[in-house]
Amino acid sequence: MARVKRGVIARKRHKKILKLAKGYYGARSRVFRVAKQAVIKAGQYAYRDRRQKKRQFRALWIARINAGARVNGLSYSRFIAGLKKASIEIDRKVLADLAVNEKAAFAAIVEKAKATLA
């Protein structure tokens, strides 16, 4: 049986990792052993942050809605309670956008929520 050396496979593997590490600082983009660790760590961060992104955006939307609601004389929790009672189903992403860009429309929604609570 002929002896098989791994030269071609190893080079392919190394090139793949070094391609993924392109743009990294110093040895992290040039040395295979260091680059491999950097790529693995980057993958872990990417995986974690894809999940955290959802939480962070929701928190941002809530902060924006709260600010807009308080300008109109209502707290966030009372505003959301009013929307639920009035059976207005607008998600937080849209509400946050209205609070920032369409202040008059947001104020009208807040007034409806206030009227339902009263």
UniProtKB/Swiss-Prot annotation:
Gene3D superfamilies: 6.10.160.10, Ribosomal protein L20 (1.10.1900.20). SUPFAM superfamilies: Ribosomal protein L20. GO terms for molecular function: rRNA binding; structural constituent of ribosome. It comes from the Bacteria. Pfam families: Ribosomal_L20. Keywords: Ribonucleoprotein, Ribosomal protein, RNA-binding, rRNA-binding. The keyword Repressor does not apply. GO terms for cellular component: ribonucleoprotein complex; ribosome. The keyword NADP does not apply. PANTHER family: 39S RIBOSOMAL PROTEIN L20. Belongs to the bacterial ribosomal protein bL20 family. Binds directly to 23S ribosomal RNA and is necessary for the in vitro assembly process of the 50S ribosomal subunit. It is not involved in the protein synthesizing functions of that subunit. This is Large ribosomal subunit protein bL20. It comes from Pseudomonas syringae pv. tomato (strain ATCC BAA-871 / DC3000). The lineage of its organism: Bacteria, Pseudomonadati, Pseudomonadota, Gammaproteobacteria, Pseudomonadales. The gene is rplT.
